[in-house]
Amino acid sequence: MERQNNDGGYTFCQYTDSSAEDTYFAVRTLKILGVEPKQKASTIKFLKSLQHKDGSFDSIKVAYYVVKTLNELGAKLEKSPKEFILSLKNPYGGFGSLNVDVEVSSEIESTYYSIEVLKSLNECINPNEIISFILSLKNFDGSFGKQGYSKIASTYYALASLNLLGYNTKSLNKTIEWIRKCESPRGGFNSNPYGFDTYMVIEDCYFGVKALEILDEVCKYPLQTLSLISKFQNGNGGFRRSIFLGISTLECTYYAVSTVKTILRKI
C-alpha cells in the first residue's frame, strides 16, 4: 500500500508518477494475497485517463495493463480499443514487431497481450492465422523463439497464447522436454538449458512454473524453488530480480507471489 499515489495508481519507486504497469502488478498481487485495494474509484479513474480520445493507448502493454486491471476492479473502458489493437497486426499473422528491444522479454509478448485484450473485451478472434504465426516460431527442440533463439519467456508466451486460442498445447511433448531442461535441481528455471543458476532471475522462475501449469505439469523441485524464491525478497517485503542485489519492484513481487501460489496449489 506504500506504493500507491494520491491519484490511485501505483509506482514501485516512491514519489514518482504512477504507471499502468505498476498498477497492474500491484492490484494483481493484492488479489493473490486476498487484500482489497484501497482508493478503487481513484485507481479506475487513473487507468481510464491513460486511454486516448480515439481509443488508442501509448502501447499494447499499456492497453493490456489497463484493461486487465479494470477487469479486476469490476470496471470497463468507455471506448473499445479494438481498432487500436487490430492496427498492430503484423504481416506474419501476429501482433507487433518481431524485432524487439532487449528490454522486451519476448517477440511473442505483443501477440499475447493483444489476444488477452481482445478476449477480455469479448471481441471475435480468428485463431488460425495467429496459431500459424506462433507455431512458425517453434524450434526443432520444442522451444519457441525467432531465428532459433530459444527463451523460456518466448516459450511461455507462445503456450499462453495458444492456450487462449484453444490449441491443444498438451500435444507439444518436445516443448515439455525443453522446459524440463531449463529446470534446476537447486530450484528455479534458467532462460534456456545452457544458462547458469548463478544468473537466474525471478521472471524466468515465473515463466517456467506457469508454462508447466499450462501443460498440466508441475515443477520437479517445488521445495527447492520455494526456497530459492525466498532469497529474492528484500527487507521491505518486496522482491528483486536477482538473488544478489537490487531494489524491490512491483513486477518482481508479483512474479514471486504468483509463482509461490501456483507451486503451493500443486503440493
Predicted regions and their residues:
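Long, well-ordered core segments of solenoidal/helical folds
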Residues: 1-9, 38-55, 76-96, 125-142, ...
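An alpha-helical repeat/solenoid feature that recognizes helix-turn-helix modules
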Residues: 12-37, 56-78, 96-126, 145-171, ...
